[in-house]
Amino acid sequence: MKKDFYENVREHALAHAHTQDTWRTRFILARTAVFPLMLVALVHGYDRGSVEELMLGGFFLLLFAVLVLRHRRLERRRIFTQAYLGVVGEYLARFDGSWKKSPVDGAAYLREKCPPDRDLHIFGAASLYQYLCAAHTRMGRDRLAAALSATPQDLTRTRRRQAAVTELLAHPLLALELEARGALLPDAHDTRVLAKELAQPLKGSLKLISCIGIVLANACVWSLCWAIFFGGSWAIPIALFTFNLTMAMAFFSRTQRELAPLGHMASALRLYGRIFRALERAPLRSAAFHAILSPLFAPVRATIGLSRLTILADCAAMRRNFFFFILANGILLWDFHCMAYFSHWRKGYGAAAADWLKVWAETEVLLSLARVGHTREVHAFPRFAEEGAPQLMAEDATLLLLTEETATPNDAQLTAGTLVITGSNMSGKTTYMRCLGANAVLAYAGAPVCARSFTLTPMAVYTSIQISDDLAGGISTFYAELLRIKKMMVYSKRGKPMLILIDEIFRGTNSADRIVGAREAIRRLTLPHAITVVTTHDFELCDLGREGIPVTNAHFEEHYEGDKILFDFKMRAGRCHTTNAQYLLRMAGIMGE
């Protein structure tokens, strides 16, 4: 069971976190004990002129430095472990439904002119996006939103993503590690801004700045050495120190402006460096992943470039210390060297940085799509039927938004024509349509679908499920539905494959007009290049097949046990012969016995 796997991973991670907490306490106690011993040994040894005590103090100083470094490394690991536990918790949330509390629901990507976004719950609360999203960068989230489309995309890219997701499914622990490293990034981190800053060339003459820095720094260092070790005049090094510091102050505003990006990107650079190192050593050997990860290795290696830039960012950060600024610039013209090196880095690596960040954004998309396979016992990669009449064949299909324990699997054997589904209220008609549409969206994205097998023709999905009026626009619910069906008819004239899903057709008008309008709409939407699924409570629509229209019937039904109404949510062939509206009215206390 997949849930058992993630619970075991969590238990192991919790034990690891407990061990880290224990070692953290030990490091704190050790540092607290060693520091005063170091001070006492050094001060006492200096006062008494004792070489032995000074050596002991030096030993304690070295020991304290080692403890500090080990403590910092442990803190980084603790932070990663906490992020890892958070990611494991997100996976476990997919099994109990608590994932719907996630604030990242993709509501910002909802488009009013794209009904499937709401009808199929692609974006928004309790949506496909909310279930899937493992992205923490803005680019990754944007790419995931673009992938979740009701319109078929480039099948070459879809199949490449399928292959990459297949490989991720074989390495669930790697997926957890990568997601945990991504979770350490700032939420919705805009990598495009970072890429732009890294690629921005330095204005002015790099060679001049570099030459000035090298000449003056060397002159000051050599004059100091001459004065200290050979008894030379101090006038020259003092004059050079003053001149260098004056130069640094004169160019301060420019160096501050040029080096400013390093200040706020230092933390992100370290995180991306660790992410790219994890990707470099990951056992991802498929051709699909090789193509995705190739920018990390050529023309320049991402980990080497980011490592050098991280060192430069640390050097630039030292300038914030006033005393270091005075000494480093007076002797070495530190600012000039930092600015020259940053410009040199931009020329060598800046253009490639944008491609590195795109690699991670695409990896975030793949990690998101893989969540279906990581959390569903029954899943399959869809097969696309690109030739012949449209078809949608599914075995044991369920809706991703329902937990696997509560979802009832159903089959689909749909070809060109219309399927009219009847059944009682709450029997599962709308959920079945959403199941078909949502799995089609997952298929187009390159994700596994919630089914034992799934074959479909790439076809645009048009929906009319959640209809609402528009008071500001003066549009009633009925007219809003008419506009949607009109769009379906307009698109159908292109002759391209379509999957049309209409729930309770023309529910917003009286029964006589509804039946007349529905019959005509179904006639016009029953096409050789379209699969149309319509739910209704009007049994009259079940007779359209007798008029020579390729219409088939299916239904959901209920049964009663005492005063309880029960559903099995299984679709059956043929029309429905029962209703439950009066029973529900009595159950709600609206109608008397």
Where are these regions (language model features)?
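Alpha-helical coupling/stalk and coiled-coil linker elements that connect catalytic or binding modules
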Residues: 1-424, 431-437, 443-460, 483-484
